[in-house]
């Protein structure tokens, strides 16, 4: 049975995801705002779960219909063939987002969908499934925008940035899916040396090592679709074959040196724990030191980092805020000087503060706007002369 899928991603990373899904040879890939769609069998969605590095979720579309009011939303949802997917023994939860809709409360919209699903299953099966908001077998996703409802099933279960590899984190860690997008959009070559001078908990270095060794991002975790009744049998055998093929692609070592550096003890502890959990101790070298003191370790390579944005946490425009601004400017000046010492290298930086770009004083060959959660940031790439 051919169905529609929609892979969500961080705003601004749609191009990276589209190229990724096309490289996976998924049928009829089409870009959209906030994600990328494709069509195919359930196995195609499973392949996206296993291999897509930049996708946040993989949604299987069950239906799309006009929903100008709550009654239309209920009836349209109830008309879908839920009994083809769920049984009375499976659990469910509904998540909703509403945009420019007559129904303005997402929780109420989710409740109407839940009512429609359980009423349909009670009618068709004689029993109703239970709701489990914390750990459901089926995650149902409603997107209600401008009077049109799209109802989907979430194949992943937990979001795809949860690779099953991170055990420790630092303040405001970068999500793995966004880190993968930074590497893809920045054109980071796994065959060249890689250094993250402000590695934090190591997300960029770990994602780079996974790419370099061709380790599929979904190999170490479970997915929601594995709990679906339709998974047992054909899809389960196909999934086992997919994972076996993915393991056969793994390289024994990364082809070039990978260095993750940080100054702070808590970050270094998280870095060591996460690299060990990922099984990448032989691939990633951990260094302790100030990023501003880094010197080139080879004639060329990639400096890739996500420096602190220096968001102003203090209210107002008082002396404390101005002092903070001066400290941030001084810090970025030191980072810029470090980058400029790396002649022959390529710097790829995810920056949330224009002070860094001003300090470097080179025109970036890439300046790509994207979003880190609610924050607008820029992916900057410089070739250091």
Regions found by a protein language model. Name each.
Residues 271-274, 283-289, 300, 316-327, ...:
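Composition- and surface-driven signal marking solvent-exposed, interaction-prone regions
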Residues 154, 197, 261, 287-289, ...:
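Generic beta-strand/beta-sheet core signal
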Residues 174-295:
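Conserved S-adenosyl-L-methionine
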Residues 89-92, 192, 301:
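Nucleotide donor/acceptor-binding cores
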Residues 154-157, 170-180:
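Glycine-rich nucleotide cofactor-binding entry segment
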């Amino acid at each position: 049975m051919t169905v529609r899928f929609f892979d969500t991603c961080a705003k601004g990373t749609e191009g990276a995801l589209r190229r990724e899904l096309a490289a996976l040879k998924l049928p009829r890939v089409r870009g959209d705002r906030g994600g990328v769609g494709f069509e195919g069998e359930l196995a195609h969605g499973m392949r996206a779960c296993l291999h897509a590095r930049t996708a946040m979720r993989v949604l299987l579309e069950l239906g799309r219909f006009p929903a100008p009011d709550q009654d239309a939303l209920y009836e349209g949802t109830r008309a879908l063939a839920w009994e083809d997917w769920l049984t009375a023994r499976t659990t469910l939860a509904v998540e909703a987002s509403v945009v420019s809709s007559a129904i303005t409360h997402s929780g109420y919209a989710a409740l109407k969908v839940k009512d429609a699903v359980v009423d349909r299953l009670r009618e068709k099966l004689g029993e109703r499934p239970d709701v489990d908001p914390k750990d459901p077998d089926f995650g149902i996703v409603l997107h209600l925008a401008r009077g049109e409802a799209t109802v989907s099933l979430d194949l992943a279960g937990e979001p795809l940035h949860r690779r099953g590899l991170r055990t420790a984190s630092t303040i405001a860690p970068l999500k793995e899916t966004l880190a993968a997008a930074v590497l893809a959009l920045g054109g980071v070559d796994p065959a060249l040396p890689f250094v993250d001078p402000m590695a934090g908990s190591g997300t960029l270095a770990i994602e780079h090592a996974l790419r370099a060794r061709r380790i599929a991002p979904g190999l170490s975790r479970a997915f929601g679709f594995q709990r679906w009744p339709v998974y047992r049998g054909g899809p389960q055998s196909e999934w086992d074959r997919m994972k076996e093929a993915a393991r056969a692609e793994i390289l024994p070592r990364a082809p070039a040196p990978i260095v993750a550096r940080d100054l702070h003890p808590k970050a270094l502890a998280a870095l060591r724990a996460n690299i060990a959990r990922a099984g990448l101790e032989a691939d990633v070298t951990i260094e302790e030191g100030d990023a501003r003191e880094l010197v080139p370790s080879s004639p060329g390579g990639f400096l890739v980092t996500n420096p602190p944005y220096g968001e102003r946490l203090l209210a107002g425009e008082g002396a404390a805020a101005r002092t903070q601004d001066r400290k941030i400017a001084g810090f970025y000046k030191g980072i810029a000087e470090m980058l400029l010492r790396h002649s022959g290298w390529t710097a790829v930086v995810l920056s949330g503060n224009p002070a860094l770009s001003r300090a470097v004083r080179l025109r970036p060959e890439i300046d790509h706007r994207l979003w880190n959660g609610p924050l607008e940031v820029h992916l900057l790439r410089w070739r250091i002369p």
